[in-house]
């Protein structure tokens, strides 16, 4: 079995999902990742980047959520990171010099609004007047806002409670909030613990997906290298399908979560390929940014197109 895995990894390192030109590796790459960043976590665990770029010092920094990660990116503590759709909008509004370098399609089943199993709240419309916990400026913020709009409610119709995932989980379990908007693997952990009910997931909410962000100077200097790094993340993510059981065991160990939680998480998010941000994705992200501005959740309008980095080696529709 070990030989099979080694052969699979060797094959991954020889294939690129991005059209990567000849790469010159920088001296270092500092990567920000989250517990739920499957492709990144597997790439880190298998040391795929370290093997592909032995001349570069690869370092990894874990963050609890996207907003904290992009703060680190803005102050120069990391070079590259992955977040949901909302953190880069808040970061751009705050003046961060970052660029979008890649996107994954949305995984609507991996992000939800939870309520207690015996809660009288049966629909999103029932959230009116209730306390809802979530990480401010995260993709769950967008999930909640879009779900409220779909149900005919305004953001001001609820009592938002801004908490990190860990603090939100505690508040939810203690009954201090009425609902919790959250993403995986926190969602799967709560689901398997029991006593919760999914009020709404991301289906039909037209979210953008997850983005890969880089400091602009780093991206401009290391374009081909970044393409290769993103291709490696996609290849690592594919292991969840080709080597599912081994990936579950490895992720359970590295994330410190039970294997059933990881299995549930993988069921919610099929592996996908990271792609360049095209005009269609940029337009959808602009709609999201405008929605947040209209609800006075960001201080000013932002132009997403100003922050889209396009690898010149790729063919297809450019911005």
Swiss-Prot record:
Q: Name one GO cellular component term.
A: periplasmic space
Keywords from UniProt, A to Z, are: Periplasm, Signal, Transport
Q: Which InterPro entries match?
A: ABC_SsuA_sub-bd, Solute-binding_3/MltF_N, SsuA/THI5
- Localization in the cell: Periplasm
Q: Does the keyword Iron-sulfur apply?
A: no
Predominant place of localization? periplasm
Q: What does this protein do?
A: Part of a binding-protein-dependent transport system for aliphatic sulfonates. Putative binding protein.
**Protein name as annotated:** Putative aliphatic sulfonates-binding protein
What organism does the record attribute this protein to?
A: Escherichia coli (strain K12)
Tell me what gene encodes this: ssuA
